[in-house]
Each structure stands twice: as structure tokens, then as C-alpha cells.
Amino acid sequence: MNTKIINVTKRDGRTEPFDLEKVHRVLEWATTDIAAVSISEIELRANIQLYDKIPAYDIHELLIKSAAELISEATPNYQYVAARLVNYKIRKDVYNQHEPWPLVDIVVENVSKGVYDGAIMDNYTRDELNQLDNYIKHDRDDTFTYVGMEQFRGKYLVQDRRTKTLFESPQILYMLVAATLFSDYPKETRLKWVKDYYDDISTFGTSLPTPIMAGVRTSTRQFSSCVLIESDDTLESINATAT
């Protein structure tokens, strides 16, 4: 990569010397155990778009773009590299670190911000949330393709649609969807139902509609995008209802 880049602009406006090794570490992580991909190819594609005082945010987006541009019929595995890079960005944006926070901390934080439904805290004890947290398999994020992870980032993860601020990562979404849907089940058995359903949806065994993926667990409590419309059994009534 272009080592002549002098400074990178951080989120708080500070500048610091461009750290090539940091880029290497991220790409090494993103390509671990993925065959037929090249760190240097990704770096070369990103190199021509770097400039002095580039925002740190843009550097990571360039890496994502560079990996995505290498996806082809001959080199399909770059779709998993690009997906990991998107997921890395999601976690940094949400948690300011690569490791997700404990589930209970995420729930408390997002309920306080008004983006999660407070009923989650009413329906589940901290101990129950901790049990669910211990069951979450964050490494399942590695099974996403680039297209799938971008769809999560842009469509399904709870976020401020105006500022694009994200409040969760994929496995948190899956676990809280399961927890919300089974919240009224008997307390003696519901954690098993939640875990089983989490396993099903987080391994793509069942595909959920957008309203459930994006709305369940939030204050909107949206479960469906369908609307029931009633009309009489006459052509005039049907036409009037449709308009």
C-alpha cells in the first residue's frame, strides 16, 4: 500500500500517522482460513484510492470495496472476506471494539436509548439474558456472504435511519428476535425454545420476513407488513376498497 500517506483523520478530528501494520492485521484476520484469496490484491486495489488525511472510516470502507471488487466466478471466496470486513466495521461502530458487549449491557443501553422495547427487560431477568448471552455464537457471522452482510447492515440491524448509527450486530439480532417471539412461553421451558429457534434462524434454517428481522425487539413491535382489508363481495365494493 502507499506508505507515503502521512496522516489519517480519526473520528474526533485528530490526525495520526498512517499505520500500515494495522491494515495488515485487519486483512490477516479477514482472510484467516479462507482459501484462494490474497491480502496483497486487496491492498493494491485500495492503494490507488488513498490520500493524505483520509478519514479512518473511509480506509475501512475502501478495504471492503476492494475485497468486493475481487469477487468473481473464478475467485468467489472474496465474498467471505468482504463480509468479514463489513462485520468488523459493524462491531467497531456499535461497540467501539471487535468483541461484542454482553447481551444484557446491549439491551440495557438500547432500551435506555428508546430503540429496543422495554418489554425485553420486563420479560427476562438479567440471569436469563446472561444465559442467552453465553449461548450466542458470534462466529456464525463468518458464514455470511458479502451480499448478506451488507443487507443486514443496511436493512435489518436496528439503526437510526437518518444518521445510519447502528445499535447491534447480527447474532444479537437473531437472539433477541427469538427471545421476543417466545417471551410469553412458560418460563420453565422458554429458554430452550429461544435457543433452539436462535440456532435455526442464525444458521439460515428458516428465513424470516423483513418486518420481523427489522422490527421485532424494537419499540415499534412490528411483526408484519401485511394489512387486512375487508370488502363486500361485489365488484363495486372491491374497487372502492382498492382505491
How should each PLM-predicted stretch be described?
Residues M1-T243:
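Extended catalytic cores of very large enzyme megasubunits
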